[in-house]
Amino acid sequence: MFARALCRLAVAALVLTAAACDSGPTGLRSGYLSLALTDAPGDVDKAVVTIERIYLQPDSTNDNGRVVLLDSAVTVDLLTLQDSLMGLVDSVRIPEGTYGQLRLVISGGYLSIIGADTTTRQIYASSPTYAGLPAGAVVTGTLQMPSFAQSGLKVNLPSDALTIGDDESVSLVIDFDVAQSFGKAAGNSGKWVMSPVLTATKPTP
């Protein structure tokens, strides 16, 4: 039942917009970046993640270093974002230059699976003590989230780069494909694995 429901899910999306300006307070050329999160209706009960940090990773031609866009935890149920946007980052100034990746540091999460009787729930969490669990929740099994809390979830940008130039506006849509991002581990371990499938594209005018 759960696998069938997953296949019917639409994607979630991170929406990025960037607008360059002449200079920042220090005289460096810079732009602005905003992030929002959205999802379309689906049948899965809950798919909750905590995004601890979001940052842009410069490419080899950019000496500006890593740019942190979000540095405070945001916990979101992807399935509540039906036909709407959730603001994550609002107009953060970023230095002019070229960036090769967007990274999301995901510190934890859980899945709630509807039982065959449609009333019971099975919960698979990254940790039994995950702070995003609802009060009184009984964890059925493990949701594996390999290395996302350390190196961050890597999202390659269109043409392998995002360039912010003088007086330029750039928009990107990053699709979080929920249907392909969660799966049950092989064998009888009872574990679920989070392997996010994210793609970054420029929206069609």
Spans of model-derived segments:
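Bacterial N-terminal signal peptides that target proteins for export
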Residues: M1-A10
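C-terminal motif of bacterial Sec signal peptides marking the signal peptidase cleavage site
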Residues: L16-A20
